Structure formats: structure tokens, C-alpha cells
A protein has these predicted regions:
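Conserved small/polar residues in nucleotide/adenosyl-binding loops
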Residues: 128-130
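A short, glycine-/small-residue-rich helix N-cap motif at loop->alpha-helix starts
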Residues: 59-63, 110-122
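Short, hydrophobic/aromatic alpha-helical segments in well-folded domains
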Residues: 67-70, 121-126
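N-terminal anchoring/stem segment of glycosyltransferases
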Residues: 2-107
Length: 130
């Protein structure tokens, strides 16, 4: 019995699937060091006042664990996963996995612009420089 993954229509039948990379950005909003640095550089001391910058936006729902499991099961053709982070990592993450490339913000953002908490800048710059 063949299990349908939902990816069959995207996969070439001749197994000549091009290798691609995934880029994923992640932040642990519960990290006290990250919170402290964010507060120090924030224009607005009370982050809850600004709708777009609420603490809930940075909450770790632990969904990343399932995302990695899904990639491993349904997208084995992925060549590399570039994991872009402020510097912290989930405790459960296998840092030695051969497909994983851990990228710190300081690896691709010029020092004069760090730290940055602008997700748009992080995402666009990581796509260009990784």
C-alpha cells in the first residue's frame, strides 16, 4: 500500500528531482538574553503597546520540531536546511545533522546594523547572502 504524501504531483516521475535548499528563520522569544537585548534597542520600552511587536509574535509554539519531521519524511530531496537564528537553538535540534547549516545573524548582516529585530531585513538578507 502506497502512502500518499501530497507531494506526488510536484515530484518528477523519473526521480530526476533537482536539489533545493530550505531557508528558515527562527527566534526564541522566551530567551532572557534575547529579550534583554531587544528591550535595550527598542524604541518603545513597553513592547505590548505596539500591535506588530507584541511578545506573542515571538512565542515559540514548538511547531518547528514538527516542521523538521515533515521535511525529513516528505521532502528527503532537500539538499540543505539553512537555519537562521539570533544565536540560540532549540535544545532538541540535532546540530550535527549533515543537512543542517546553522547561520547566525552576524554571519550575513554587517556589524553596524546589528542587532536587528526586523524580521523582513533578516529574511531578505539571509536569502541574498546564504
Amino acid at each position: 500500500m502506497k502512502i500518499r504524501t501530497g507531494m506526488e504531483s510536484f515530484m518528477k516521475q523519473d526521480n530526476n528531482i533537482p536539489e533545493i535548499d530550505f531557508v528558515i528563520t527562527w527566534v526564541d522569544g522566551n530567551d532572557p538574553d534575547w529579550q534583554k537585548q531587544k528591550m535595550e534597542y527598542s524604541m518603545q520600552p513597553d513592547l505590548s503597546q505596539k500591535q506588530d511587536d507584541r511578545k506573542e509574535r515571538y512565542r515559540d509554539w514548538d511547531l518547528l520540531r514538527y516542521w523538521f519531521r515533515g521535511v525529513e519524511r516528505f521532502a528527503p530531496w532537500v539538499r540543505r536546511i539553512h537555519f537562521v537564528t539570533w544565536g540560540h537553538l532549540p535544545s532538541w535540534l540535532n546540530k550535527e545533522h549533515p543537512k543542517l547549516n546553522i547561520v547566525n545573524h552576524k554571519d550575513f548582516i554587517p556589524e553596524k546594523y546589528l542587532p536587528t529585530f526586523n524580521s523582513h531585513a533578516i529574511e531578505w538578507l539571509s536569502l541574498i547572502h546564504i
